[in-house]
Amino acid sequence: MVNVEEIRNAQRAQGPATVLAIGTSTPSNCVDQSTYPDYYFRITNSEHKTELKEKFKRMCEKSMIKKRYMHLTEEILQENPNICAYMAPSLDARQNIVVVEVPKLGKEAAQKAIKEWGQSKSKITHLVFCTTSGVDMPGADYQLTKLLGLRSSVKRLMMYQQGCFAGGTVLRLAKDLAENNKGARVLVVCSEITAVTFRGPSESHLDSLVGQALFGDGAAAIIVGSDPIPEIERPLFELVSAAQTLLPDSHGAIDGHLREVGLTFHLLKDVPGLISKNIGKALDEAFQPLGISDWNSIFWIAHPGGPAILDQVEEKLGLKPEKLRATRHVLSEYGNMSSACVLFILDEMRKASARDGLSTTGEGLEWGVLFGFGPGLTVETVVLHSVNV
């Protein structure tokens, strides 16, 4: 007769959770940031707001974004004028879009990750799906299970409306699932479509306008598992530890509220200051067990909430400019895609490391950190260990 302890030991994996594959996807509609203010004020019938348009132009110029991808085309917006208004009842129209499109975009990213992984999709044991938009029952996790043809017994976890920190959250959850379930292979998908937050400009709500200048659409998928099968699975990064914390004195710094008018977005000016002031403590707690205190000796993946956050973190910690290269590259090429961003950066980093002939997936370095920042103000901190190329 076996005891519970023996059963538990048999259920656990031997090694750390490992990222085994990464896939990304975007809508086909690409938006040039330099011409976006003209387009945005025209499509929202706001061209008479000339001073506000100049303000928005400056926001776009300072955003450090070159282009973004958006499911909302001019044609879709013309068919749904209420989405273009500042505060018109439009939730039904928005929901009709995202409930369908979020799982579809997630499917494209997942198929790429599964292809790189090289194993049969029938070996996926768990699915973690994360999106800020489109709450529905059954959820996007169910829709994706059907779209991909996953096993009906796949264990699903659906995360709605977490916001920009959630790319770190899904890694934390996937780590626990993989390490506590021997042989588990977790498909993690973050799919974000901004149709819930798009709205016309208003002088009274400038933080909403900041969102209109930053947010883009994208989906990223990863496969996570412990004890990679030699010769078959190729590890990319190991997930060493993961923590979540609420920053002090940050209540109301980033808020989102689902209303008849869609998801309204509220942002206090001091968000970059709050993050940069507290990031050192998060790093100390994460890396003290490893005896690491030189933040230039590790590789960096930080959610690019906006350029001001990156600039202030860089300055506060004395980071060399190249530390946030991968992060800034993704911000420039895609904008802020909420939870999907850090997974895009993970993908960019391993690809650039291989392209540049570096010795590890983490820009030639052994240890790294991944940060998610979002509503709360919540910070997710994931310690990563790179793999030799």
From Swiss-Prot:
EC number: 2.3.1.74
GO molecular function: naringenin-chalcone synthase activity
Chain segments annotated as coiled-coil in the UniProt record: none
CDD domains with a match to the protein in the record: CHS_like (cd00831)
Keywords from the named record: Acyltransferase, Flavonoid biosynthesis, Transferase
Pathway recorded for this protein: Secondary metabolite biosynthesis; flavonoid biosynthesis
InterPro entries: Chalcone/stilbene_synt_C, Chalcone/stilbene_synt_N, Chalcone/stilbene_synthase_AS, Polyketide_synthase_type-III, Thiolase-like
Function: The primary product of this enzyme is 4,2',4',6'-tetrahydroxychalcone (also termed naringenin-chalcone or chalcone) which can under specific conditions spontaneously isomerize into naringenin.
Keyword Acyltransferase in annotation: yes
A Pfam family recorded for this sequence: Chal_sti_synt_N
Keyword Nucleus: no
Superkingdom, taxonomy of origin: Eukaryota
Name of the featured protein: Chalcone synthase
Organism per entry: Catharanthus roseus (Madagascar periwinkle)
Active-site feature positions: C164
Gene Ontology annotations of biological process type: flavonoid biosynthetic process; polyketide biosynthetic process
Residue pairs linked by disulfide bridges in the UniProt entry: none
Catalytic reaction equation(s): (E)-4-coumaroyl-CoA + 3 malonyl-CoA + 3 H(+) = 2',4,4',6'-tetrahydroxychalcone + 3 CO2 + 4 CoA
Family, similarity comment: Belongs to the thiolase-like superfamily. Chalcone/stilbene synthases family.
